Amino acid sequence: MNSRPLLVTCGLPYTNGPCHLGHLRTYVPADFYVRFMRRKGEEVVFICGSDNHGTPIVVSAEKEGTTPRQISERYHTHFSDTFTKMQVHFDHFGMTDDPTTHARTKHLVSRLIDRGYVYPKVIQQAYCIHCQKFLPDRYLEGICPHCKKPARGDECDQGCGKHLEPGEILEPTCKICGNRAEYREQEHFFFKLSGFQDWLREYLGELKGTDNAINYALGWVNEDLHDWCITRTLEWGVKFPGHDDLVVYVWVDAPIGYIGFTEEWAEKTGRDWKTYWCGENTRVTHFIGQDITYHHCVFWPAMLHGAGYGTPYAVVASGMLKIDDHKFSKSRGYVVWTNEDYLDQGLPADYLRYYLLSYTSHTKEMNFSWQLFQERINNEVVNNLGNFIYRSLHLSQKQFGGVPEGVVEQEIFDRITEAIGQVTGLVEAYDFKGAVDAILALSAWGNTYIQSKEPWKLAKTDQAAMAQVMRNCLQLAKALTLLIEPVMPERAGLIWSQLGQDSLIANNGFSAGLEPLSPGPLPAPSIVFSKIDDKMTQELDKRLRDRIDALDAEKKPKTPEISIEEFAKVEMKTGKILSAEQVPKSTKLLKLQVSIGDEVRQIVSGIAQFHNPEELVGKDVVVCTNLKPAKIFGIESNGMILAAGDNASLLRPETPVPSGTKIR
């Protein structure tokens, strides 16, 4: 066991919208890791909070006619409540807009200034003449200078993903009014990131965590690092020391929130926050989405090192999320909202936790679909784990009233010991899928064991042999319950009670899985894992499809409306086709002679692929008669035959009417 204090953090949820599955890809694995490390005896502090500053929140507040603080408080409460429902339990969940983080930010930035790592510089800043204001970050959109894709003011979100400094974006456009912005000079402050290049290269060589985070950061550090503008022209945020007209950039105060939240936790628990953030023996592990790797592996450690703080021990970055094999997109409807689409539908938090941890490697892109979700839960959780645990409890309770007398065989203890060691090694290597697979492998072995021993037959022939089998199975069930608790804590707690355990399962280490159950009665077991039926899956999938279709329909260009007076200008009459022939050298056009009562019109129509000329003669049609004459393939056309659909179905009167009758 490592004696260095362990502090685990999660990337801060931004208080500008509700929780979705993309968020949980970070928070559930972090909670799993914390629970697991505590089960193996480590003392762990689990810290997080909400990110409250930056232009998107200001823009949203302006649209709603409220304040950034009110929006932040609303979504802070939302995330806190959602995490509780998802069994993600932080020791402290703070707000970056609270006084502690404001004070810690000013202190850390002041130390960087005092040590010569921050300097002023006049730069080109986007300015909207119409709105008469400078446009930081998300107030601005334009074209990425690197990949030429559409981009936000501070990030190329639709292309290369690079961070953009003020003044870099091409074709700057104000998001408030939509007018083109211009660049004007303004003084801002820069952090000397370029001065940390050699140190960062050495630091990243020692950083623990996942390879996707470390390798991505090394790719940046091995290029030329540019100094980083750390101020913005905003009223909302942490004031830059000595300049009340500027605030620090949100990616400065957001990670400093980790320290501020630790201070708040330490104050209420009587601990010393410096134990976790100062000195060389700190062990801070950040769980993040891979889209914010640059900030956590380059900007953040350089700031900490420059200010004299300890640096992160490990960075664990999750892969991105796809919905139904489509890129995650809120604007296109490819999103699953944690509350609205999942928890509010009565689905267990534990099932979603299992899927997020077991579907694929933590660092790889994850695909979510309701069909896949149903298959994984029913086949792996219910048919494997649930089946073994319920059969073990049911047969033991039915035949012996509980745990039978006897001694667990050594083979069972060996299997449990091996599984605990294997799972522990995988978790410590941040291979969460591998760890869950190893737990399910022990359960699968248990199913094979009970099937091969056939205790239901032994009940009639050899009670002592059956007692031995069930004693072994119950010990496996106990160990499995302890191992699966970090994955599915709520269900594990229910099984723990059915195993006759009075203690909280969270207060037991994995070694308890090797402690024999006391012989004696057990309560009648109940089914803990239920299958997800086809009807529910279809309903959930329909919700997703309806959202996608609705948003897609909104984006389709609408046909411009016209007035009744404009429509009245269009003259349409019934007609009868007198002759029809193919236009030479054309596969699509027919030349028609059409009677419209008092005259015969020559009309060229693109219906040749769907109608034989000889079959058209004598047919009634509807003709637009007041179109200007046009030449098509060199032939004059005086009107238009009306047809519908891809097969050019001809429109005709319901009952015969004289040619030349007006359509009204």
Swiss-Prot record:
Q: Could you state one GO biological process linked to this protein?
A: methionyl-tRNA aminoacylation
Annotated motif 'KMSKS' region: location in the chain?
327-331
Q: Which reaction does it catalyse?
A: tRNA(Met) + L-methionine + ATP = L-methionyl-tRNA(Met) + AMP + diphosphate
- Swiss-Prot/TrEMBL cofactor(s): Zn(2+)
GO cellular component annotations of the record: aminoacyl-tRNA synthetase multienzyme complex; cytosol
Q: Which residues form the tRNA-binding domain?
A: 566-664
UniProt keyword annotations, A-Z: Aminoacyl-tRNA synthetase, ATP-binding, Cytoplasm, Ligase, Metal-binding, Nucleotide-binding, Protein biosynthesis, RNA-binding, tRNA-binding, Zinc
The listed locations are:
Cytoplasm
Main subcellular localisation: cytoplasm
Is Zinc tagged as a keyword?
yes
The UniProt annotation puts motif 'HIGH' region at 13-23
Quote the EC number.
6.1.1.10
State the free-text cofactor note.
Binds 1 zinc ion per subunit.
Q: Where does Zn(2+) bind?
A: 144, 147, 156, 160
Query: What is the enzyme's class at the highest EC level?
Result: ligase
What InterPro entries does the database record attribute to this sequence?
Answer: Anticodon_Met, Met-tRNA-synth_bsu_C, Met-tRNA_ligase_1, Met-tRNA_synth, Methionyl/Leucyl_tRNA_Synth, MetRS_core, MetRS_Zn, NA-bd_OB-fold
**Recorded GO terms, molecular function?**
ATP binding; metal ion binding; methionine-tRNA ligase activity; tRNA binding
- Binding residues for ATP: 330
Tell me its family: Belongs to the class-I aminoacyl-tRNA synthetase family. MetG type 1 subfamily.
Record's function text: Is required not only for elongation of protein synthesis but also for the initiation of all mRNA translation through initiator tRNA(fMet) aminoacylation.
Tell me, how does this one assemble? Homodimer.
Name of the protein: Methionine--tRNA ligase
Which organism encodes this protein?
Answer: Methanospirillum hungatei JF-1 (strain ATCC 27890 / DSM 864 / NBRC 100397 / JF-1)
Q: Which gene encodes it?
A: metG
